[in-house]
């Protein structure tokens, strides 16, 4: 078909043509692809660097016509007598490529999807935005979509187009500020980013996809097209088993883990998810923990942040394998009867230029005003929770982990920093809310909405808050004015109890109230007692290093403290290495010091933690009082002189009970009388002074009660309290 060159550019203005050539055009579909003109169909393609292009009929494979050069910059055009399904045969300097034309496809995202994105209620965001493997009209490829409402132009770039932003500019869907493009014949594994021109015409550093489901391992920063093939889970019985409420009422003993440093091979290589499923999962099961809590595994640029400064909120870090490898690890955990909790960070994000910061050239995910949008403690940016799309982005991220990866719970990091506008700020450095107060009302509503949606869509999932203040109602339902979390870390108990146990025993009597104070508020929330990674870093030393005294006393103090914790109301959490009394504080670049288990004292502590977990899981009395005040009484709260504390834990019907008595001095107490509710023979189930744990072997065994009133109870036991030890006795 003979066509004049001017006809190839009919309807294309001079300014529009140069905007396309220079990579500034915001509506490429108005020029590229098939267009009706003068009774024929003109097809234009912009392929800088191509030597030639042929138009091929898709059905037959025959060459219809070669493309003509419409502009020497790389704009080619061809004419068809009537519209047909066609392909392009492109000749490059290094070979040929046959593909469909990305600009021959119509609108990709539905109006409902766009509406839900704008409303902040599109909870399956990774199935709409990001890179989605799919087929359109039997053409396989990848649909790219990204929210960048203030950009002048957005292109998808990757190895497939030599990272040239001129080659594949995207279509803007004005109603939602979302850019979209279908790239035929791309497959999972392709690297990509977005190239964005900001409102002022500046080309930004290429951006990783905020909703990517896979990423390159750091320090590389490209996003990766993830497969749409579903992992074949084998955990149906686990997922359909206990409800969240049943799990909350039962034993919860959490082993907190940094995946990269739990165990390293010679040479310092971290284990991958498959290897962790073979090593970590059997260990946790053998130790009797009910859950593993993983420090954040979302993609993050700086390993030294331990994952707490993530940028890929939908992508597992590539440090330990593929997304499918992570799913395999979780599946193996569930097969072993172990739940998986994930640390999740909606409070802030790092300032890396290839990430979310000023994503489209404006403060899109963050606040514009640094008094709201910059966190000086961490040099990070704060999410703008007043924006629907940002709230929806975060909630969709939470659901991604719970639904796609079968995560059993999220521990939400740095909640306090979100709840207070003046958090870690001086006067004049923060903006009050609309009522003049310091509360972040947008964050309050965000948490209520987050927890309501999670509980509605994921009945199995637990939501846990790391909230370091006394904000009221963290674990109350939203309909009762609370934030809706299931549990909260008891930071106050952790600080108080560690402060006490770090003191020389000679001074503990003066601080006795530190150990009893926690019970004043113990039932104001549903608490987890956390001895977390935060307590063994930044010069704080290891758990063992915090203990006073000589080596024997250090181990005795730590054994007694952990048994007191396991006997105290509240679910349990301990960071890896604490269960073996690792001598040095945690180093994320090194393995836990497993070789210390060759020493009896370390092996003894490990055995104690295992036995404490076993007794806790078997004994209803140690579970019921975690959240119910009728499941707890002080047996001896006021013996400051002897630094002795006694607790009674009750089963729901009070048919059985457990007595927990701690002697926090190095002086054995012989003939220590303590009141008990039941008559009969009480059996010592655990004593931290047992020889198998590294103690001196001063034990009680079976103890018959006497009809001698004590501590307001009609019966009492005549006990031997070993030095620096805790004993747990079960009622008849």
Swiss-Prot record:
Its EC number is 2.4.1.18. One of its GO terms (cellular component) is cytosol. The keyword Calcium does not apply. Pathway: Glycan biosynthesis; glycogen biosynthesis. InterPro entries: A-amylase/branching_C, Branching_enzy, GlgB, GlgB_N, GlgB_N_E_set_prok, Glyco_hydro_13_cat_dom, Glyco_hydro_13_N, Glyco_hydro_b. Keywords: Carbohydrate metabolism, Glycogen biosynthesis, Glycogen metabolism, Glycosyltransferase, Plasmid, Transferase. The active site is at 413 (nucleophile), 466 (proton donor). Pfam families: Alpha-amylase (PF00128), Alpha-amylase_C (PF02806), CBM_48 (PF02922), GlgB_N (PF22019). It catalyses: Transfers a segment of a (1->4)-alpha-D-glucan chain to a primary hydroxy group in a similar glucan chain. GO terms for molecular function: 1,4-alpha-glucan branching enzyme activity; cation binding; hydrolase activity, hydrolyzing O-glycosyl compounds. GO terms for biological process: glycogen biosynthetic process. It is an enzyme of class 2 (transferase). NCBIfam families: branching_enzym, PRK05402.1, PRK12313.1. Catalyzes the formation of the alpha-1,6-glucosidic linkages in glycogen by scission of a 1,4-alpha-linked oligosaccharide from growing alpha-1,4-glucan chains and the subsequent attachment of the oligosaccharide to the alpha-1,6 position. HAMAP family: GlgB (MF_00685). Belongs to the glycosyl hydrolase 13 family. GlgB subfamily. Monomer. This is 1,4-alpha-glucan branching enzyme GlgB 2. The lineage of its organism: Bacteria, Pseudomonadati, Pseudomonadota, Alphaproteobacteria, Hyphomicrobiales.
């Amino acid at each position: 078909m003979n066509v004049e060159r001017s006809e190839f550019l009919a309807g294309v203005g001079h300014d529009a043509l140069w905007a396309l050539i220079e990579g500034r055009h915001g509506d490429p579909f108005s020029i590229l692809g098939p267009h009706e003109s003068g009774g024929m169909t003109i097809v234009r393609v912009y392929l800088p660097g191509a030597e030639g292009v042929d138009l091929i009929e898709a059905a037959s494979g025959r060459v219809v016509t070669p493309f003509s050069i419409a502009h020497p910059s790389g704009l080619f055009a061809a004419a068809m007598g009537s519209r047909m399904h066609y392909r392009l045969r492109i000749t490059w300097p290094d070979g040929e490529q046959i593909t469909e034309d990305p600009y021959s496809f119509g609108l990709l995202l539905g109006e409902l999807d766009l509406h839900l994105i704008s409303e902040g209620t599109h909870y399956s965001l990774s199935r709409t935005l990001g890179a989605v493997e799919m087929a359109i009209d039997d053409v396989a490829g990848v649909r790219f979509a990204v929210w960048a409402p203030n950009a002048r132009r957005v292109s998808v770039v990757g190895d497939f187009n030599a990272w040239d932003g001129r080659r594949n500019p995207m279509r803007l869907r004005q109603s939602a500020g979302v850019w979209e493009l279908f790239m035929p014949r791309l497959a999972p594994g392709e690297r990509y980013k977005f190239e964005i021109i900001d409102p002022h015409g500046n080309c930004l550093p290429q951006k990783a996809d905020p909703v990517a489901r896979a990423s390159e391992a750091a320090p590389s920063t490209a996003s990766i097209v993830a497969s749409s093939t579903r992992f074949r889970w084998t955990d149906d019985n686990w997922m359909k088993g206990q409800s969240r409420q049943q799990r909350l009422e039962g034993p919860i003993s959490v082993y907190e883990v940094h995946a990269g440093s739990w165990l390293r091979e010679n040479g310092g290589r971290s284990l991958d998810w498959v290897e962790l499923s073979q090593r970590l999962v059997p260990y946790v099961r053998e130790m009797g923990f009910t859950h593993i809590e993983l420090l954040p595994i979302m993609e993050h640029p700086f390993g030294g942040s331990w994952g707490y400064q993530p940028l890929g909120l939908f992508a597992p870090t590539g440090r330990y394998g593929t997304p499918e490898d992570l799913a395999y690890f979780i599946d193996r955990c569930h097969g072993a009867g172990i739940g998986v909790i994930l640390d999740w960070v909606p409070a802030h994000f790092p300032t890396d230029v290839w990430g979310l910061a000023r994503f489209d050239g404006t403060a899109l995910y963050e606040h514009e005003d640094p008094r709201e949008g910059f966190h000086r403690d961490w040099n990070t940016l704060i999410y703008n929770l007043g924006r629907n799309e940002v709230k929806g982005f975060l909630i969709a991220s939470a659901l991604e982990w719970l639904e796609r990866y079968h995560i059993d719970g999220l521990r939400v990091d740095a909640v306090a920093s979100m709840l207070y506008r003046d958090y870690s700020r001086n006067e004049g450095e923060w903006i009050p809310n609309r009522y003049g107060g310091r509360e972040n009302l947008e964050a309050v509503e965000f948490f209520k909405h987050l927890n309501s949606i999670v509980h509605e869509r994921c009945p199995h999932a637990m939501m846990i808050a790391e909230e370091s203040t006394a904000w009221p109602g963290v674990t109350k339902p939203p309909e009762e004015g609370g934030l809706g979390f299931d549990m909260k870390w008891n930071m106050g108990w952790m600080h108080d109890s560690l402060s006490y146990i770090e003191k020389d025993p000679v001074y503990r009597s003066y601080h006795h109230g530190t150990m009893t104070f926690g019970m004043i508020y113990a039932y104001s929330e549903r608490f987890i007692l956390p001895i977390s990674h935060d307590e063994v870093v930044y010069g704080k030393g290891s758990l063992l290093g915090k203990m006073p005294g000589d080596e024997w006393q250090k181990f005795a103090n730590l054994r007694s403290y952990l048994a007191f914790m396991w006997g105290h109301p509240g679910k349990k959490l301990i960071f890896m290495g604490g269960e073996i009394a690792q001598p040095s504080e945690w180093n994320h670049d090194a393995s836990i010091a497993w070789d210390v288990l060759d020493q009896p004292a370390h092996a003894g502590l490990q055995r104690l933690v295992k036995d404490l977990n076993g007794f806790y899981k078997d004994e209803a009395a140690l579970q019921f009082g975690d959240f119910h005040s009728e499941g707890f009484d002080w047996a001896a709260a006021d013996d400051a002189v002897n630094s002795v504390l006694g607790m009674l834990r009750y089963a729901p019907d009070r048919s059985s009970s457990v007595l927990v008595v701690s002697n926090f001095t190095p002086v054995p107490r012989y003939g220590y009388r303590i009141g008990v509710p039941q008559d009969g023979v009480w059996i010592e189930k655990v004593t931290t002074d047992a020889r198998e744990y590294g103690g001196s072997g001063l034990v009680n065994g079976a103890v018959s009660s006497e009809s001698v009133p004590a501590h307001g109870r009609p019966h009492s036991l005549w006990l031997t309290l070993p030095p620096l030890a805790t004993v747990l006795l079960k009622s008849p």
